[in-house]
Amino acid sequence: MSWIIFYTIIAALLILDLGIVHKKNTVIAFKSSVFLSLFYFIISCLFGIYIYHNMGLDHAREYYTCFLIEKAMALDNIFIISIIFQFFKIPTTYQHRVLFFGIIGVIIFKAIIIYGGIMLIHKFSWLLYIFAVILIATGIKTFNVSHKTYDIQNSYIYKSIIKNLNITHNLEGHKFVIKRNNKLYFSPLFVSLILIETIDVVFAIDSIAAIFAITNDVYIIYTSNIFAILGLRSLFFCLSEIVERFSYIKYSLALILIFIGFKIFMHHYIAIPAYISLTVTITSLLLGIIASIMRKNMIDHK
């Protein structure tokens, strides 16, 4: 029953998103984007209350912790998505269409990765320690890297697409696939969609590794992941400005990843309850936001 309720909510949100709010290919206003993302955030929080009533306080804490971590980590690939759109010269009017179908792919791929990961961890529990090393290494690396970059032309996926598919250099409206002379051609919209899906899968490895350290409940992991991504995709059109404004969030995320990595190594000696993980996550993010605001105010007053 819980799965039916979740998928019903997601289906309703997707229908609302593409069928009503973005039925026409128009540029999404900043205020509309913020409002829609806030709407998704409220729905996500209400779903956490539903989990609390049906599964208990600890599961609700795990849900909110996973949700916030996924939200923060998903911010990291916004720049790369923006680079992909710029590279293929995708107009703003069509970007939402690509992101929407990207969400459909994420819903499928996340399910495969999460179920596969849970099965592997149950069979090979030592994999958690590998995840811990990945998380700590990623956290340390985040402190030393100012911006993520993505070399599209030299990426394996892009080269494979160009080599094996008929690609058009120009857009034909909002079409992903075009038929010419009994041949199928794929537009830049299609190529950008494939690259974004690939990026989502790569980024999912870090985020899922972090969340496995919080809980191994498939329902909590999957629902928190999907709700976090839904809200971010709707906010994409103003997110570059927000990410620039909150430039220290990445350091908050680095601290969270390192904390979770050490939590995995210490779980045999110290049982860290869900409320501590949630407290560390919220505190780290708030400190990052406050530090970012203070930095921006100092720059503005110079």
UniProtKB/Swiss-Prot annotation:
The answer to whether UniProt assigns keyword Cytoplasm to this entry is: no
Q: Which GO terms describe its cellular component?
A: plasma membrane
* Chief location of this protein within or outside the cell: membrane
Task: Give the keywords, sorted.
Answer: Cell membrane, Membrane, Transmembrane, Transmembrane helix
Location relative to the cell: Cell membrane
Output the InterPro entries linked to this UniProt entry.
Integral_membrane_TerC, Integral_membrane_TerC_rswitch
Q: Does the keyword Aminoacyl-tRNA synthetase apply?
A: no
**What's its membrane topology?**
Multi-pass membrane protein
**Any transmembrane segments, and where?**
1-21, 32-52, 67-87, 98-118, 120-140, 194-214, 218-238, 253-273, 274-294
Task: State the similarity comment.
Answer: Belongs to the TerC family.
- Matching NCBIfam families, A to Z? R_switched_Alx (TIGR03718)
Identification of the protein by name: Uncharacterized membrane protein RT0774
Q: Which organism is it from?
A: Rickettsia typhi (strain ATCC VR-144 / Wilmington)
Instruction: Specify the taxonomic lineage.
Output: Bacteria, Pseudomonadati, Pseudomonadota, Alphaproteobacteria, Rickettsiales
